């Protein structure tokens, strides 16, 4: 179906259908519960359902203590499989994801599903650090009767430390690179090589790369860049 609703309205639909429950856990409690050993198929680091079985009295006690609840999905589902352009098929158990934060704001996973559907987004290209969220979003789309987009999760650019490339690594903007003698054309060539669109040392222009682009041939491992030298490490 086409989506013309706001994320909070779609969250209310799931709530009215009995597919949610209030969660009073603090972030610290969630971290501790997620890191503790537990039975069942819940993946490491996922919310283990601490507040799922609270009685009305227990909920009232938490409300009286001044704990505003978040709203969580009661995700009674087995592994959810998604098909990614680069990663292929992969599956994960969906945990009880937050739909509405305890300040009343729709949470990311619900918001991105509803907003993308409302805007007619049918292709999503993003960093592979978000791949683990995709089964959650696929399950939410299915519950809401919304179409799943096509996903393509691309590897990140990392700094020499192996962490995600960031401003703290320095020389990540064109002016900073230009000050090191790295031209815009040099940047284009470095990027082309990293995407397997050109060979090292091959002179290329942007127009040359259009016909070479093929999503399924893109690399699936991170690319490490030394921003101080403007050179690719891997």
Indicate residue ranges for each PLM-predicted region.
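Active-site cores that bind ATP or allylic diphosphates and position pyrophosphate for catalysis
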Residues: 28-167, 173-178, 223-234
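Nucleotidyltransferase catalytic core that binds NTPs
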Residues: 1-41, 125
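Residue-level detector of family-conserved "landmark" positions at structurally sensitive sites
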Residues: 24-25, 151, 187, 202
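Residue-level "edge-of-site" marker
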Residues: 26-28, 154, 190, 205
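A generic secondary-structure signal for well-formed alpha-helical elements
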Residues: 15-22, 144, 195, 199
